[in-house]
């Protein structure tokens, strides 16, 4: 176990180890406890347009249950954090941010757009990631509806009397799901998944090696407040409309870099 962002995180699990957990996720299904990530709801008359003032992504173009990767920018175009944004409905967004940046992110959002939206952190929700080629059949044994989900979508549903949010997304380069559940139900839900022999626990070490192998950025290593999306090779996160309209923090610097 190692300390990380105020949590004790497992680097690896007994009987497995980083390499075995990495390979098991690539060939079967790895289960990661990522409850340290920050979860929150952003609500208001038009939270997507409000959020677009501080991110360069197309949030207003999201449909219900669709999610998008984007970055939170400071006034110099530097990356405060990268995050996932899901539109639940026209008045509600679901945010997932990095653990080490959670307080900073939430404070920045409140400072910049707090007069237009309500930010509701969800500290009593846990988060698990089920990743790998056998993740879908493993989760579908418990919740058949997930088999029809498409990449980068999220659905809210009831399971055994608990509200859960399931997205088809991940941080490993594999097919998989990220599952937000009430903390009080997390252990029972994990045990149900682990009854399937294809599912094994995987720790922080394998999570890092898997994302590195997949070419995915890690905040604090590949991204920071002195690095713009252009410098981080994240130009693809800034669509045509946002390039034409601007209007986000640091836009003058970022858009000038895009033209070079």
Identify the residue ranges that each predicted region occupies.
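Conserved, structured C-terminal
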Residues: 1-13, 19-21, 88-260
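Well-ordered mid-protein domain cores that form the structural environment of catalytic cofactors
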Residues: 58-112
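Generic preference for hydrophobic/aromatic residues in regular secondary structure cores
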Residues: 29-32, 42, 85, 117-119, ...
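Charged, low-complexity, helix/coiled-coil-prone segments
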Residues: 41-56, 80-88, 129-139, 195
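Residue-level marker for the onset of beta-strands and adjacent loop->beta junctions
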Residues: 38, 68, 81-82, 115, ...
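Acidic active-site catalytic centers that drive phospho-/nucleotidyl reactions
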Residues: 33, 82, 178
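Acidic, proline/glycine-enriched N-terminal capping motif
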Residues: 1-72, 78, 204
């Amino acid at each position: 176990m190692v300390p990380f962002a105020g949590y004790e995180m497992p680097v690896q699990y007994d009987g497995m180890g980083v390499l075995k957990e990495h390979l098991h996720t690539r060939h079967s299904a790895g289960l990661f406890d990522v409850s340290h990530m920050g979860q929150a709801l952003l609500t208001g008359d038009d939270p997507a347009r409000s959020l677009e003032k501080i991110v360069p992504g197309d949030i207003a173009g999201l449909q219900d249950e669709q999610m998008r990767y984007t970055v939170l920018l400071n006034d110099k175009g530097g990356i405060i954090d990268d995050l996932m944004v899901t539109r639940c409905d026209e008045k509600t967004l679901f945010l997932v941010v990095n653990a080490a940046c959670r307080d900073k992110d939430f404070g920045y959002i409140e400072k910049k757009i707090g007069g237009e939206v309500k930010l509701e952190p969800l500290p009593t929700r846990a988060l698990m990631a089920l990743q790998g080629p056998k993740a879908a059949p493993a989760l579908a044994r418990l919740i058949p509806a997930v088999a029809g989900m498409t990449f980068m979508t999220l659905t809210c549903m009831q399971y055994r009397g608990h509200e859960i949010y399931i997205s088809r997304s991940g941080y490993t380069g594999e097919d998989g799901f990220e599952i937000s559940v009430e903390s009080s139900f997390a252990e029972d839900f994990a045990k149900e998944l682990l009854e399937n022999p294809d599912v094994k626990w995987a720790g922080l070490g394998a999570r890092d090696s898997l994302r590195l192998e997949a070419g995915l950025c890690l905040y604090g290593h590949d991204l920071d407040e002195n690095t713009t999306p252009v410098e981080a090779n994240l130009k693809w996160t800034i669509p045509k409309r946002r390039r034409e309209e601007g209007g986000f923090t640091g836009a003058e610097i970022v858009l000038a870099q895009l033209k070079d």
